[in-house]
Amino acid sequence: MLNRARKQDLTIRAATPTETEDVELLARWSDRVHLRFQINCLPQLVRDGHIMLALQNGNLCGLTYATVDHPNCSIRGLVVRPGRSTALVVGAVLNYLLPAAKAVDALSIAYIGDDPWLVPFLVERGFLPSGQIIALRRPSVSLTAEVDHRYQVRCARAEDVEAIVAVDWAAFEPLWRNGAQTIREFLAQMPYFLVSTVGGRIVAYICGTSYGKVGHVVRLAVHKQLQRRGIGTMLMHELLTRMAEEGVRGLTLNTQLDNYGSQAFYRSLGFYATQKPASVYRYML
């Protein structure tokens, strides 16, 4: 278990801007890479203090990007340098992450993926299977949506974080909820982040990014009391419209394999499954 892992001689500290080139080289050329973000985001992540380095006697052995948040933390990136021990790097990362997660009273630490070089070490330290997510794809950005003028759509702002978190918590079960830190990171990283309001109150949000001509929806949440009223479709339409203006021609997203309501909604919009599901592992705190 994490709290019983033996201490190693690796130290963890935040990367500095002067180390950005080393961070990028490691992420691009290592044979053990787990990234759930675009690699070109690394310079910004370093500047924002999110990239943590695993060092041994001052030598770079690996790096990680983990969102430490309440109610859930997530491992969004982990890289091990060629020739270095996966066990030592993963152990050092988890020994750093566990106290940080406990300090914010997190429910869990999540990892999404099936990396054969990484999963056994996470399982050894107490991570357990916790469902799967499925990737869906839509090969077109054309989408018709009825406009309900009671609901307005605008870009999210920094002062919206608390209201966005409230919507997220009303839409998802506890282990899938995003907290304020996650939303702040999304606001900083996502080129597309929209909210839907009624009477000035935020009732839904959508955020995403793009990879060349393919857009990706990172999150869509509608307050539970206002679902099935076309708000999600309206937000998706607005997101697709804005992405299309930037040259995007198709869209992807992920949803829980056992969330049949969510899958039915996305399929009604023209999405279809594209690959086998990815596993979710959690360390429960």
Predicted region positions:
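Conserved acetyl-CoA-binding loop-helix of GNAT-fold acetyltransferases
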Residues: T86-P99, V222, R228-T241, E245, ...
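Helix-loop element at the rim of GNAT/NAT acetyltransferase active sites that forms part
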Residues: L25-Q38, A166-N178
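C-terminal "cap" of GNAT-fold acetyltransferases
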Residues: I134-R157, R249, N254-Y260, S268-L285
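Conserved donor-binding loop and adjoining core beta-sheet/short helix segment
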Residues: Q38-A92, V198, I206-V218, H223
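Conserved hydrophobic beta-strand within the GNAT/NAT acetyltransferase core sheet
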Residues: I109-I112, V217, L251-T255
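A short beta-loop-alpha structural element at the N-terminal edge
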Residues: A5-V23, Q152-I164, T274
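Conserved active-site alpha-helix within GNAT-family acetyltransferase domains
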Residues: D114-G131, R229, T233, L257-Q275
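Acyl-donor-binding surface of acyltransferase catalytic domains
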Residues: M1-R4, P71, R81-H149, S279-L285
